[in-house]
Amino acid sequence: MVVPLVAALFLVNITPAQAEQAGRCGPVRVPGAEHQEVRRAVDLTTAGGVTDPADWAGLTPAGLPAPTAVPGTQVDGYFPDDSTSNTNHGWNHDSQFVIRLPARWNGGLVVSGSPGVREQYANDRAISDWVLQRGYAFAATDKGNTGVGFYAGGDAIVEWNQRVTQLTRAAKALVREHYCRPASRTIATGLSNGGYLVRWQLENHPELYDGGVDWEGVLWREDGPNLLTFLPPALRGEPVFPAASEFLWPFYRQHYWELTQRIYREALDPDYEGAEADYDYASRPAARRAVREIALTGRIGKPLLTLHGTLDGLLPIDQDSDVYAEMVRKAGRDRLFRYYRVEGGTHVDSLYDAFPDRLRPLTPCHRTAFAALERWLGGERPPASATVDRPDTVSPTECSLG
């Protein structure tokens, strides 16, 4: 359910003619969109804007400060698609997007795909709020399919990559029309599946971006490791995750391991009929062919900063980002790459609230990495890749990468 969080928001639907006047320069028209609704807003953030709190629940620590108001224009809409899993706005239509255009623009654009199988508002608290306050325009997509049945249309993960590319091109064109000049920089960022999308975009469409920040992106490799190689052993009770994360395993087992294994196996190997714990990726040639279509190579074409928590209970760091960092090195692209292994970080920051003496949130580390990328694009090299120690005093707002 999409709601304005403050009744006095002054969000109004406007006609195309009014939208033209509302823009700082040109019309608010998203190229290729089948439907769009444009609103002027006193606040584009989660403190007062149109969003879906259920979509971003659990992704950030409770102590994250509320954002200050950012006035501007919001565009909600969808691109042509024939699947209907996303019910936001009562549209029952996938490939939904949100684009936010702050009145005080810094010249930049941030593009993001949703984590997990969430919808287009999933990054609002973790990413949109913060980049809007820095003056960026922000665009996010539901990736073309949502929910635990996301795989129903086939080639679902292939579509994710296509939808992020589609949105990036459309958002860049919209920004150029709205502000009467092109974006001076375009940054891709996202977490989990969204981090995978950052990696894929910088490998396959570096011409669209100036750089990216990958927050615990999912690794897909035809030869493994990938979700389908390490989740079945975890379900069988084999040691997959670091022993130091054992206190988190009951949570991840209950909420993530089997569900994640099942839905991604359904997406990539729908003919398998056995128990998920017994799944053997190496013996499933159809699955290998499907993963080949979405696989990463490490051949990034623009600067990328990756961060990953050492206590991630869904994506074991030694079978995910450690491997991706080595792929980048072997591809000869390490000059474009920084990798920060964050001690005490886990996959979802809400767990920090339950274990503040053992974990640390990654949200502030993502913001530090984003600021480091900004400086890198301005000519200042970021800190060297490193394992970032957990400090004695942990804050939901502070993180030093070195």
Which functions belong to the PLM regions below?
Residues 1-20:
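Secretory targeting and sorting signals
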Residues 22-95, 99, 215-299, 384, ...:
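Accessory cap/linker subdomain of secreted extracellular hydrolases
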Residues 64, 119, 185-235:
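Primarily recognizes the serine-hydrolase "nucleophile elbow" in alpha/beta-hydrolase
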Residues 270-402:
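C-terminal subdomain of alpha/beta-hydrolase-fold enzymes, centered on the catalytic histidine
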Residues 101-106, 157-162, 170-192:
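Gly/Ser-rich "nucleophile elbow"/oxyanion-hole loop immediately N-terminal to the catalytic nucleophile
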Residues 105-109, 133-138, 181-186, 207-211, ...:
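Loop/turn elements at helix/coil->beta-strand transitions in domains of secreted/extracellular proteins
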Residues 111-172, 177, 345, 350-358:
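Cap/lid segment of the alpha/beta-hydrolase catalytic domain
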Residues 75, 84, 88, 98, ...:
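A fold-wide structural signal in alpha/beta-hydrolase
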